[in-house]
Regions:
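Glycine- and aromatic-enriched membrane alpha-helices
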Residues: 1-155
Length: 155
């Protein structure tokens, strides 16, 4: 339940201040359902995503950004602060803003992919990206920090 609430909050973050309450609720419901589906898919393909970080924040933020374009209320997008968005809403409506948000999301993913590739290359060259199977089986808390995160007797 807490993950669903976080997913809803992640989804509404891009739209905060640009949608009315019914649209905010809709964004929260759609985002939570989509993130739940992403968590299920992640588990079925055995994708290593601790705490469902990408399934909730990556997917939730993407859905929220896209739904902001579809559901933004023109009256809540001040032309003084967001002239391009206000202009798009005025000339092309929410569909035009949705297309602009798709472009922004694609550009963001591209930027993040390049940055991640650079970081992975550096980390891989300096310390390596994986631990041995034996270390992973023993537990990284013990191997890397010399202590257990949880008392094995309570599990």
């Amino acid at each position: 339940a807490a993950t669903g609430a976080v997913a809803g909050l992640v989804g509404i973050t891009p739209a905060a201040g640009f949608v009315y309450m019914p649209q905010a609720l809709l964004i929260g419901v759609i985002t939570s359902a989509t993130c739940y589906l992403a968590v299920q898919i992640k588990a079925s393909i055995k994708f290593d995503d601790s705490l469902d970080a990408y399934a909730v924040h990556g997917v939730g933020g993407t859905i929220g950004a896209l739904l902001t374009g579809l559901l933004a209320a023109p009256a809540l997008v001040p032309a003084d602060y967001f002239p391009k968005s206000a202009e798009i809403l005025e000339t092309s409506g929410n569909l035009g803003l949705f297309v602009a948000h798709i472009k922004a999301v694609v550009l963001s993913y591209g930027f993040v992919a390049i940055g991640t590739a650079i970081i992975l290359w550096i980390v891989g060259a300096v310390v390596g990206l994986r631990v041995s199977s034996r270390e992973e089986e023993r537990g990284l808390d013990y191997v890397l920090h010399g202590e257990e995160a949880y008392d094995p007797m309570t599990n």
